[in-house]
């Protein structure tokens, strides 16, 4: 909940300019939040990545070494491959970007 509240604060749009934008060249046509360029890009990354880190609360009892879902070799299979063909400037300044796309650069 805190994550979405923080993101809403970051991406407030003037009510006179309210419009919904969608990415059409990607699977799913996800809603984009804002066009970010220049110094807005590192600020957004800092704010979004900081919010994500604060949500990672350490476990009370640690990891169970016998649980296959927590073994490193199994966990790495689920890692998302970062896109190599685009960078954050193209994603957010040229095409507009969604919050999830900014979070990929954390």
From Swiss-Prot:
<comment type="function">
    <text>Insulin decreases blood glucose concentration. May have evolved to activate insulin receptors (INSR) in vertebrates. Molecular docking studies reveals unique interaction with the human insulin receptor. In vivo, insulin-like peptide injection reduces blood glucose levels in two models of zebrafish diabetes (streptozotocin- and glucose-induced). Also shorter swimming distance of zebrafish larvae, an effect which is not observed with human insulin.</text>
</comment>
<keyword id="KW-0372">Hormone</keyword>
<feature type="disulfide bond">
    <location>
        <begin position="92"/>
        <end position="97"/>
    </location>
</feature>
<dbReference type="Pfam" id="PF00049">
    <property type="entry name" value="Insulin"/>
</dbReference>
<feature type="disulfide bond" description="Interchain (between B and A chains)">
    <location>
        <begin position="37"/>
        <end position="93"/>
    </location>
</feature>
<keyword id="KW-0732">Signal</keyword>
<keyword id="KW-1015">Disulfide bond</keyword>
<keyword id="KW-0964">Secreted</keyword>
<feature type="signal peptide">
    <location>
        <begin position="1"/>
        <end position="18"/>
    </location>
</feature>
<feature type="disulfide bond" description="Interchain (between B and A chains)">
    <location>
        <begin position="49"/>
        <end position="106"/>
    </location>
</feature>
<keyword id="KW-0119">Carbohydrate metabolism</keyword>
<dbReference type="InterPro" id="IPR022352">
    <property type="entry name" value="Insulin_family"/>
</dbReference>
<feature type="propeptide">
    <location>
        <begin position="19"/>
        <end position="34"/>
    </location>
</feature>
<feature type="propeptide" description="C peptide">
    <location>
        <begin position="52"/>
        <end position="82"/>
    </location>
</feature>
<dbReference type="InterPro" id="IPR036438">
    <property type="entry name" value="Insulin-like_sf"/>
</dbReference>
<protein>
    <recommendedName>
        <fullName>Insulin-like peptide 03</fullName>
    </recommendedName>
</protein>
<comment type="similarity">
    <text>Belongs to the insulin family.</text>
</comment>
<dbReference type="InterPro" id="IPR016179">
    <property type="entry name" value="Insulin-like"/>
</dbReference>
<keyword id="KW-0313">Glucose metabolism</keyword>
